[in-house]
Amino acid sequence: RQRQMCIRDSCSTIQSIDKALVARRFAHARNTYGREALVQQQVAEKMLRLLTKHACPSAAAHNGDGNTRSLSGNASPFRHIVEFGCGTGCYSRLLLHALQPETLLLNDLCPEMRECICDLLPAGEPLPHKPLLYDDKVELYGAKVPLEKAKVPLYGTPLISPAVSFLPCDAETLDFPQGTDLITSCSTLQWFADTERFFTRCHRFLSDGGILAFSTFGKRNMQEIHTLTGHGLEYFSLEELKALLSSRFEVLYAEE
């Protein structure tokens, strides 16, 4: 079960996680992860829809059917974006193409993930220069699954490649660029040891009115395995997450 949250800038549980082991296992699976992780692809698509709907309403017009379409000539409301736990770049590519930021800092625990996102980095192949118009059948560059139902707004017409960089390290200790407009991630937060401290750090690095947007797993994820074996990650409930955020952030949207 997934939770999505968008939080505007405005009781800590610490769990013991072998991050070196986590990094090795994700690195080992990196060549097949993008092909097999269909749920993560769907989560990334939904995250982008929620982000554009709830965190930047001035950049989109909403139809009666609830879908979001781009407004002609609008610039992205997020000039500087950080994605922690970028993995193989599924969500990264959606952010890059839909929001077209000036800078995009990608972070992951695994240095090997650079191989999976090399096409987005200056040393890799350049991104294609092509129109990015709203189209129900558009397939964003690099996405594994066509986004026929995603209907995300695409800002501008030509694709302008921003300064994309990759920094492999533990996001819990990473000093993000000061004045970041959006700190975001999909399906990563559950691996963190001290979530409350991380939220505090995010607040420090966000710009005035900046956004923290993330999805993570809920308490019922892998519940049967946890019950049978007694092993598994400790997940927060939705109310627990909101409580951790309440002292520093205004919650714009949260769902389970």
Where in this protein do the model-derived segments appear?
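Class I SAM-dependent methyltransferase SAM/SAH-binding core
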Residues: 80-136, 142, 156-174
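A short acidic, Gly/Pro-enriched loop at the edge of an enzyme's catalytic core
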Residues: 172-183
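Substrate-binding/catalytic lobe of Class I Rossmann-like enzymes that use SAM or dcSAM, i.e.
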Residues: 234-256
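Conserved class I S-adenosyl-L-methionine
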Residues: 211-240
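A short SAM/SAH-binding and catalytic strip from SAM-dependent methyltransferases
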Residues: 181-195
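Short, small-residue-biased leader/transition segments that mark boundaries at the very start
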Residues: 1-7
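A short glycine-rich, Lys/Arg-flanked "PGG" loop and its adjoining helix->strand segment in the class I
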Residues: 196-211
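Conserved alpha-helix/loop element of class I SAM-dependent methyltransferases that forms part
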Residues: 38-57
